[in-house]
From Swiss-Prot:
Expressed by the venom gland. This is U2-agatoxin-Ao1t. Insect active toxin causing rapid but reversible paralysis in crickets. No activity shown in mammals. Does not show effect on mammalian voltage-gated calcium channels. The presence of a 'disulfide through disulfide knot' structurally defines this protein as a knottin. It comes from the Eukaryota. Belongs to the neurotoxin 01 (U2-agtx) family.
């Protein structure tokens, strides 16, 4: 019985500490995530299509991974 009560109290404490992420904030995508390029590693975003931010073409390495050609 004590174990059940302790478990319930711990669960309540954990859920009260964790704040839910607002839906609007969680669904917002940055410009890069919507279809831009990932310039820090010269990899194209999967949604960017056959281009990079700098105008270079993307080479498809896998379905989700493409690399900018210089």
């Amino acid at each position: 019985m004590k174990a059940i009560i302790s478990l319930l109290l711990i669960s309540a404490m954990v859920f009260s500490i964790i704040e839910p992420v607002p839906k609007k904030k969680g669904l917002q995508l940055s410009e890069n995530e919507r279809g831009g390029c990932l310039p820090h590693n010269k990899f194209c975003n999967a949604l960017s299509g056959p281009r990079c931010c700098s105008g270079l073409k993307c080479k498809e390495l896998t379905i989700w991974n493409t690399k900018c050609l210089e």
